[in-house]
From Swiss-Prot:
Entry protein name: Effector protein hopAE1
GO cellular component terms given for this protein: extracellular region
Family statement: Belongs to the HopW family.
Keywords carried by this UniProt record: Secreted
Designated gene of the protein: hopAE1
Alphabetical list of Pfam families matching this protein: HopW1-1
Bias (Polar residues): 1-13
InterPro entries with a match to the protein in the record: T3SS_HopW1-1/HolPsyAE (IPR029378)
Region (Disordered) location: 1-31
Amino acid sequence: MMPSQITRSSHSSLPEVAPASGDAAGVSEQTPQQARTVAFFASGELAVAFGRTSTAPAQDSVRLLSALQRELDKQQPSWPTVAQLCHSLAEVAKTEQGWHQLASEDQAPAPALKDLLERCIGRLADMPASHASHDSLSLACEGLRTARLHQSVARLTARPPALARAIPDLLALTHLDPETLGAEPPVVSSYTLFSHFVHTAKQRTAELNDSLQRQPEAVVSLLRSHADTLNDLETLPGALQALTENCQDAPACNELRELAEVVGALLQLLREHGILPRLEAISIEPGEAPAPGHEAAEPRLTRSQALLKAGGNLVRKFDAYGALAPMDDKGLLALMRTPAPHLSPDQMHAFLNKHVLHLTQEQRDIVSNTPLPFAPEGDIEARCGMGFDEKLRLALANGSLVLSEEQLARLGHLPSAATTTSDVVKTLLEKPSSALSEAERDMLGAIVQANGQGQLDAWRAHNEQLPAVLSRSGLPSDVKDELLSLNQSMNAELGTLKNGASFKSRILASPAMLLALAPLPLAVAFVSKDNSYSSSLVAHFTKNAVFMAGLMMNELTNARTNVDHGLNRYFVTVLANAIVAQPTFARNEHLLEQVGFGIATAVASGAATLGVFNRESIVAAFKLAKSKLSRQDTGNASIPEEDHLAVVRHFDVSEHFAQQMKVATELYKQDKSITDIMNSSLTYLGTKSSEFQARFESVDALRAGLQLAEGERKADPDFYTKLGLVALTASIGAALVMLMKSMVGKADYAADGVWCVSEMLKLAMNPEVDMQKAVQVFKEIVGLNLVMTGFLGVNKVWNFLDKGIKGYASGAAVLTAANLTLPGMVGEVAGAAAGKGLSYLTDKGKAAHQAGRAAASWAGNYVGTSRLGSAVGTLQTAIPGRIAGGQVVAGLYDRFRYLTGSHPTPAQQAAGEP
């Protein structure tokens, strides 16, 4: 239950501070801070936390300020006198009348307290610690700081804008004694008023944050005038943590945790507006511990250290580093391999609740004691579900767990992607890793854990049910075999992720390919005496050797990985050289230099390459043509509705696994890196899962005699950058063919260029492929072409490759080094730049279309407008992730919304629920 709503008394109406309980001796042993804390708990009043009383002041603050200024103006001030005046001023500031006088100081003929404080602080900084008056001046500064604190609090509570009143509440919490909260009753008998105070402070802070974001001018102007006092807020995170650790009341602890979250946002906003110093500007003396809530600023680097750090960051971009260096695969693999949960959407929701709901200990006990029902053999979700979260869901369902109004309100504010303005999700997606707060990192980790933990076992167990599911589907046998084949390929990849690949496939396959396939192309190149071509092959196969080492080291190198490596790194080169091997070794230069022979070689090589790399698409096209030309068995059109729902649900859950895995991977890569091999494995799973789902939907609609509705294309935030890589690949291929001297080289690189463009285009059109996978393939198949273009362009001017063995060796070494370092880095940058250009041109094209359509409509040319609109509609369908205004919609938003439960389950869809 929430504490009853208690209306605060006015800050100017203050009760006398009296001991809450205990005998006189107990009270006398209390420190002033402890006494203020006890009194604050008894009253819940802001002024009591600062020790303010209603006692009439013994002196007038205006006279004290004037006397202090006169003393400071003397050539030799009496520092004991200054200390006494400052102490008296601090005592006056604690009275109600003193508050009002200091709050209206600018209207009185008195010197400014802030200026006097700055003068004393400056004098103290210049005075050696061994000086006889150092202690007196230090006490004077302490008294002035106390008076200045009370003045700022008085002004912030008495003047508009009212939103600034959150600051006094927060400052009050820094003046409490945390250990008093842990004292046994009767010292502290109730947390009700304290909990309400913190709750109000949280609301006011949230309003202040909103004001600083929307209309900051007035608030910033007021707060900046009290920046010296607001520096005390730097200690607030540590104070809140200490209060939470000592607090014995669960609702109050929850309020303190929530307040800590909004306080973190406030401190960041105050730094952005220059009211508080940025973290990097906060210096810490040697040997001094950083203040609570502060992160120690990184020490300034020397020039050599900065160059070394920049060099390290550059090396991490090199292709060879990515092939050989260990990444963070083990962390993500360990999470996925842990035999814990597959989370259904409801369980996912519950998991996030645990991270933001902050259950009390009593509520946690209720959840822990909730029994889990027996899970049938076929219920994969129940058998693999996370225990605590499943219990939480059941406890809520059976009514044993009752949430407070505040907790229920939090449920309504869970991170959601219903709109792209969702603060939590937007922060996780857009902030760089270094800028994430601790709470944001916790949420990011929670989402990764919820989507990744235990997925491998659960997904494989789910896939093993497919034969039994298909027996109820009514689909023809050939379709069942096709679906089982796709299912088997996914399970094989899941098995590699779970257990690693066999030692044999890792150690033997890639070295065998290098030893068996490299000699022929190298021999042809050297015999043909085309130095530019042979040097490119030296660079090519040297990089293959580096990639070979990376494949041997990585535990995920399975048969599919080796096949992809062989096709991407060897096939085109070996094929082109095999065609020209006989005339080359026979010294038939006449044939080799004929244009017709070169064209025939390029066509044959290109056709074979396209056929091999598009073999699955070609087979699918033949099957489609066969089905249209002959009557095919569509299966049983009449199967029980219960069976149909079970089959549909199985395929939906399978796609749900794939989406969860992708979410976990994308968010994991926000903060860490994974190898290209692991990323390729996860991309393969996502692609096969999409094929699996699409194939079932098409054949199931055909079985039922229904027209399959055209589904929405998945959003792809990397589409334009991948398309930029396609344009870059095409331009590189064309330039390289022009630079090659021999027809053998021209034929090889012409076929290679066509193949590279087709492969990069397939990646661009596949929404399951992210930019890392696209850059990986670019490095493998286009990387050498990229560096060769520049290299041969330079050689065309100086011709160093033909100037003896020394010139050739130097050129080959430079080309090899460039091939091992530059392609991925250059491709990523160039692809992003080209992608931005394509996106810009698309937006301009849409704007031109809209203007043309308006003009055509005005002229009455409705037919032309309709055709134009249809063409643009087709274009928009072909370009994924676009909405009105040219904004790219990040695909993760939709997936996150699916996982947080707003996506209907198959059962809800069947029942017609929203």
